Amino acid sequence: MKFIFYLFSIFCCLCSCAQSQNISGRPDAVRIGAQFARNSTIGRVAAVAVLAAVNDINNDSNILPGTKLDLHMHDSSCNRFLGIVQALQFMEKDTVAIIGPLSSTTAHVLSHLANELHVPLMSFSATDPTLSSLEYPFFVRTTVSDQFQMTAVADLVEYYGWKQVTTIFVDNDYGRNAISSLGDELSKRRSKILYKAPFRPGASNNEIADVLIKVAMMESRVIILHANPDSGLVVFQQALKLGMVSNGYAWIATDWLTSYLDPSVHLDIGLLSTMQGVLTLRHHTENTRRKSMLSSKWSELLKEDSGHSRFLLSTYGLYAYDTVWMLAHALDAFFNSGGNISFSPDPKLNEISGRGLNLEALSVFDGGQLLLEKIHQVDFLGATGPVKFDSGGNLIQPAYDIVSIIGSGLRTVGYWSNYSGLSVISPETLYKKPANRTRETQKLHDVIWPGETINKPRGWVFPNNGNEIKIGVPDRVSYRQFVSVDSETGMVRGLCIDVFVAAINLLAYPVPYRFVPFGNNRENPSYSELINKIITDDFDAVVGDVTIITNRTKVVDFTQPYVSSGLVVLTSVKRQNSGGWAFLQPFTIKMWTVTGLFFLIIGTVVWMLEHRINDEFRGPPAKQLITVFWFSFSTLFFAHREDTRSTLGRFVIIIWLFVVLIIQSSYTASLTSILTVQQLTSPITGIDSLITSDVPIGFQVGSFAENYLAQELGVAHSRLKALGSPEEYKKALDLGPSKGGVAAIVDERPYIELFLYQNPKFAVVGSEFTKSGWGFAFPRDSPLSVDLSTAILELSENGDLQRIHDKWLASDMSSMSQASELDQDPDRLDVYSFSALFLICGLACIFALAIHACNLFYQYSRHAAEEDPAALQPSASDGSRSLSRRSKLQSFLSFADRREADIRRAAKEKASGLGGSGGSMSGVSFTSSGSGSTTASC
């Protein structure tokens, strides 16, 4: 036992010595640099927070034992050149890491120096998304990248249903790169930046006003403002003067606004009045213990600050505080891994010679790569929440508060997180649940928008540039009821035009427009070329009989269809005379066969049920066969003479007569239709038979039917013939394929209906083989298409759409076209139509026969017992057993064929004969039971 104690003591001594050696190997102080701009709001807060963090770390024995952080701070005063010089000064004095800079633009330059000298550059405010760890490995962003902020803004735009936005931003790396990221995120959501309005850093009030005037002339009323606080506040002041912070506008400012407002002890009411209804974002931080401790002693920290100004703690101050702790944890791990603070000359700098340049003072941090690795491996709970990096070098769990500026303060209306999107529940609560970013879960509280309204801004208006939107209309030469252009006056009219004008008049805002004809006035134009004019910006919209098809929806947006359409087959037809065998046409062959079989089945079933009790169903076999046929078919006319006496027989007859009544009524109605309505026939039965044949097919010039037949259905181009007018339709069909015409025409239903109204001798065969409609075409993501769709639905609901239809097309045109549609199997009834009736009747027959058979077997068993009791005993041999079965079958069939009354009479006679001879049988007497069986008594 003492030996074990000695070993344990030796082990503890060795560990203590090793630890002492490890600690003693650490330097007494580690030099770190920090760069701020005290003339900025973020810089003032961050400077105090960094000093507080250094003091807390140096007074904490659990972190960096035996080593103190030696902080050296420089004030760049937002001067980029000065910031670069100060960074060089840090690197001349063996600095292991630099906290800062504030500016993304400065960070781009300093990151190159950090990469060369292996000094980690840890910035808590450089949010430019292009400052990636791939290009700048020694740049460490200790705040949330603008990549996530722009994702949050894009989610806001999608949540409110806006498709176009205008961006105003400062024209530097910070502004340009963030807006570029926003554009990428919006495109993923089928939205876009309509207009980008940059302004130079330090722009004057007049310059910003000029930018805003251009923005006001754009159609988008959703404005994203990404700027520095100084210039951003000027934007709001000038926008208020121009009336741009009013009803109809929606403003979203990035987190620069909250970074300016949050530190303010007293919010300036005059300043807030310039941004009423603005939405902005704020970095979301959890309520951690370290955050509470820092907030509670903030006022004391301000007294120690040399600035003597009062301001509150902001989220950037929390990130600055966590940055120092992040570096401390990394240095602790660095020393624990055996790292040493040492520097060596950069051989590349030795090759550069220059008077007055002290380049040899710049040295490479030998342990920089190891320290960088330890920084990326930190994992602790800081003032902002969990501090940890993902594989891309970004802090985990990026989140923002969505803040609304209203009245004299700020109101949080929701949250955004990369985990669950928009929500009214805090992100740290949602982290405990499975991720869910469905549309139903994306929620925010109500927002009061500019103009003090709770109604969400529409987000766009027509641009205030005095220009009208150009609307292309097809200059048709046929079917001009739908759309036509007067060659003399240039007036555009037709059903499509009236629908468009009626829909435009329902909009809540004016739409300046003018119609521009498209075509050569000799033949119908190509509608595909007309749609392409929208893509090339020759037209702002297309109005006409434009079919909504898949290929077109990929390049333009369509409104709600205002006319239903679809491709049909039109062909010549011949009259079909009724003929002498017309009475057979109401039923199909299968229906005739099944009906005839059921007549025979019913006759047979009734004969089986009535044969033993009804003399009308007895007699010689020939007579019985005739009776079965006569009885079954006479039920067709309800003229059967034979009386049914059994209950089961009557049950079957009742059901069968009901079936006969239905069949007879249907037959009469169908035959009447066949004999009184003109029947038409055609060798073409629909699109399938048309494709498989080799006959030529006509189509309308300019229609999509040509491409559909050739590309989708595989019809050879040599079979397709272009036709330009109803007259050409009629002529081609009259000639037929043998004389240079066509066998059929494939076109859209509205045109065919109009053609059939004037030419009733033709007909549509088969059914529509495509389903589509006509709509108005607009550029992709055009908000006008959405509003017009709503207006078209309103026209349909209030009946105006039908009234416009009746104005241009005859009211009875539809009924005429429907009457001209050809059914290749008119009014013929199939078995399927009566399957339920036949099934019920069949089940009734089976049920009746089952009961009848059970009753018959029961009667036979009693009869056999009376006739020969020994026959019921089992036979001894196989031969006798076979004879017994044959005799039993013959006996049963004989019994089933006999009249039931005869069997009862014979049983009674036998019973009375046995009773009369009772005196000579040794006192044995027999009595007859009520059921015809006999019992013996001694």
UniProtKB/Swiss-Prot annotation:
GO terms for cellular component: plasma membrane. Residues 922-938 have a biased composition (Low complexity). The chain crosses the membrane at residues 589-609, 619-639, 651-671, 831-851. Residues 21-588, 672-830 are extracellular. It is found in: Membrane. Residues 610-618, 640-650, 852-938 are cytoplasmic. This is Glutamate receptor 3.1.
